[in-house]
């Protein structure tokens, strides 16, 4: 099991007594997954994985490490899912919409801006997989990932159409209506894989392999011109509108008030109360 420094203590405790070895990523002498596979596997081996859970860029590093050794991939099934019978379902938290008052730019304006970028690149299709990119582009927010206002989804765009892949139950009727008015079709979350197989064989496709999973990229036709470029949403998302800058200032005022109250409480109670990091965090 490979994990970073955040989980060294937890991993060691929870794996104690098992047959699983903890690999502390970044530590001296600890191989990367790619290095480990290259060292341990025999020529001609098959490497099994769930292509929906690893990025294409990650598998690119694996491919490079085993080059010339006649190895192949098997990624059609999630074997863990077959034995994890009580596995929790994917999150289905309701999505809400941000008004232009907060975003400073309408969904229609954002879609037009991204389509202009696609036109400059000569792209026929844009595949979006980064949840923050999709949330920003559509002015929608969710609660599917703890402490991140995003929702589980994929999205594709052409010059005159857009498809949002998600569980429709997380959208209310009003949001569905406004998305339809902006030319956005809704489809089931996992339909993207079969839809990508139907893409024109000569299409120019933009997809960020650093965020797109392996199966997304490899569902596209082999003959398609797949350009592994940074999502054209990333830079526009980073440029804050006037409304966003003003709202950031308001948020900083609220944050400053909370910190000021906390510092007052701390000075007043140091030496009087038994204050730990945990109790201080709860107070804050």
Regions found by a protein language model. Name each.
Residues 1-284:
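A composition/biophysics-driven feature that prefers long, compositionally simple stretches
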């Amino acid at each position: 099991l490979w994990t970073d420094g955040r989980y060294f203590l937890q991993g060691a405790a929870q794996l104690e007594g098992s047959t699983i070895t903890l690999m502390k990523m970044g530590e001296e002498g600890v191989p990367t997954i790619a290095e480990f596979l290259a060292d341990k596997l025999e020529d001609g081996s098959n490497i099994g994985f769930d292509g929906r859970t690893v990025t294409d860029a990650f598998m690119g590093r694996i491919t490079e490490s085993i080059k010339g050794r006649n190895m192949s991939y098997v990624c059609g099934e999630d074997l863990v899912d077959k034995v994890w019978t009580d596995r929790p379902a994917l999150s289905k938290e309701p999505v809400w919409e941000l008004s232009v008052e907060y975003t400073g730019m309408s969904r229609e304006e954002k879609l037009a801006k991204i389509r202009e970028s696609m036109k400059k690149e000569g792209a026929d299709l844009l595949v979006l997989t980064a949840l923050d990119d999709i949330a920003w582009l559509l002015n929608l927010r969710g609660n599917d990932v703890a402490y991140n206002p995003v929702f589980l989804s994929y999205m594709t765009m052409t010059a005159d159409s857009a498809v949002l892949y998600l569980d429709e139950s997380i959208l209310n009727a009003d949001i569905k209506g406004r998305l339809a008015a902006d030319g956005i079709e809704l489809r089931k979350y996992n339909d993207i894989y079969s839809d990508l197989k139907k893409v024109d064989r000569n299409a120019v496709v933009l997809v960020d392999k650093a965020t797109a999973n392996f199966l997304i990229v490899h569902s596209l036709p082999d003959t398609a011109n797949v350009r592994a470029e940074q999502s054209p949403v990333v830079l526009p998302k980073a440029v804050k509108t006037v409304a966003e800058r003003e709202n950031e200032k308001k948020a900083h005022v609220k944050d400053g008030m909370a910190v000021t109250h906390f510092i007052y409480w701390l000075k007043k109670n140091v030496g009087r109360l038994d204050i730990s990091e945990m109790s201080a965090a709860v107070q804050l």
